[in-house]
Amino acid sequence: MKYFIIEIQATEDTATVVTPIQSESSIFAAESKYHQTLAAAAISPVPYHSVVLLDSLGRAVKEPECYIHGGSGSEE
């Protein structure tokens, strides 16, 4: 079974989807990579960063983890 880590990084005017594909056969290896990605997201400079671990059928293995970093705070 393959696992995919989907990373969504959003800046003020763009949203980028970064998809490092993890082809480990072990869920433990995929989970390890998932937690490493979460740790990187926690210190990411982008305002919004979401990470989700999916199985090969696109089903979420873990619920999305989101980090919303501080910004100007103004909403219009």
Q: Where are the language model's segments positioned?
A:
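Short aromatic-glycine-(Arg/Gly/Cys) micro-motifs in beta-strand/loop hairpins
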Residues: M1-T19
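Hydrophobic beta-strand residues in large extracellular and virion-surface proteins
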Residues: I5-I6, Y34, V51-L53
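Generic structural motif
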Residues: T11, I27, S56-L57
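A short, charged, amphipathic alpha-helix used as a generic interaction element across diverse proteins
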Residues: A15, E24-H49
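Solvent-exposed serine/threonine-rich low-complexity stretches and specific carbohydrate-binding patches
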Residues: P20-S25, P64-I68
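Short, mixed-charge low-complexity intrinsically disordered segments
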Residues: A39-E76
